[in-house]
């Protein structure tokens, strides 16, 4: 049965014609579509989708319970995408800059982020800056690209 709900990502399209088919397993065509579908997944409480669309090498480090709690305890107020860009001549890497707004028991909040994404084997993945990647600069990249970490995802992680 088709949903008549408007997609939470802010596109104005119906959920089934927008992020819903990504939630059902169709790969997102680009990083912006993946980011929008991840926002929608937070709104809808789809923690399994959030985990599955995070870089596989980081998935074990995610706090599923905290993700579920944040999703359930927030009233999601909107998403604004500022830009989506491919940098460094590497089309399998992309940045999406966005602002997400929500309300919880502590009031209204907004979070602006420039998120990094990587494509591997036809699927885009979010590179979570809060979950470390255990790789030396000369090790194979955890995204499974076949490149060394220093020439691949290392350049897309925040420097601390």
UniProtKB/Swiss-Prot annotation:
InterPro entries: NTF2-like_dom_sf (IPR032710), SEC_C_motif (IPR004027), UPF0225 (IPR023006), YchJ-like_M (IPR048469). SUPFAM superfamilies: NTF2-like (SSF54427), Sec-C motif (SSF103642). It holds the Pfam family YchJ_M-like. Transmembrane segments: none annotated. NCBIfam families: PRK00183.1, PRK01617.1, PRK01752.1. Belongs to the UPF0225 family. This is UPF0225 protein PP_1119.
